[in-house]
Amino acid sequence: MHFKRALLSLIACAAILSACSHRVASKNIRIGLSMDSLQLERWKRDRDAFNHRAQELGADVLVQSADGNDALQVQQAENLLTQGVDVLVVVPHNGEIAASIVDSAKQQHVPVLSYDRLIRNSDVDFYVSFDNFRVGELQAKYLFDHVPKGNYVLIGGSPTDNNARMVRDGQMKVLAPAIDRRDIKVVADQWAKDWLPSEALKHTENALTQANNNVSAVVASNDSTAGGVVQALEEQKLAGKVLVSGQDADLAACQRIVAGTQSMTVYKPIRPLATRAAEIAVALAKHSQIESNSKVNNGSKDVPTYFLMPLSVDKSNIGETVIKDGFLKLEDVYHNVPRDKWPKGARE
């Protein structure tokens, strides 16, 4: 009887020790990557580049995509924690709701890296992104430099995405003085749920109707919303006549730029972002010191932050940026353009 009781106690202790030491016993660092969605082209690039660098550093990556579902993302993050990840990297669909993910991770002493989008009102450990305020500045400055007066339409991103707010703040820093002088009139100011092209299409159609098609520029906050904007302009035979901004240098957007229906995009080189994020994630797992170059207040704390700088891209420099970097291939970007209109040296 005593032997049986002792054996059961030994088994129970072994089980507890096994559960508690799972992370320590694992040969490689395990990174949990919780992604909002993989529907947009750019996020697949993020995932692949992140995986590549993490594997170079000897880490294993477990990826979950929530398809824009808040409850599912929380559930998936809990599952990653249950699998014993050493660090959690989160691209939140909703920066407020994702705070519960951080709470759960903290209870298990797992550090959390907020990737590209800030998790608000939480004890998140680190934030890595592009300077989204600067993204908005670049968009608005490009349009304002080309059309300093006229009717503008503002199409923001998802209202639940903190990045969308930061982009808008950057846009308004440039545009506000001209609006105050009445050089620019904002005829519509809308937000596109989940950054959907269909939302941008609807809002732009309504704006064109209200303004009797008298619109000079549309400040679209990313390339997917720009796609919806251009579709609405095409319906009114205004594509190429109204300036349209964007962000992400998606293939479809770059094709529109060289075709002349989208004016510019903001190029955020994904590989450097994902590479830096993987390096930070590994450092967090090892409890190593991490270099930051900024801080961002998320409503709860000043979060150590590493910002990368975005670039303004239009038809004049697309070859020296997006294509030269290998982000997109020239033949893909110019696919819809007659070959005799391709850049010199690429027509053969």
Q: Residue locations for each model-derived region?
A:
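Bacterial N-terminal signal peptides that target proteins for export
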Residues: 1-8
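A residue-level marker of the well-folded mature domains of exported/periplasmic proteins
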Residues: 20-348
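Bacterial N-terminal signal peptides
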Residues: 9-18
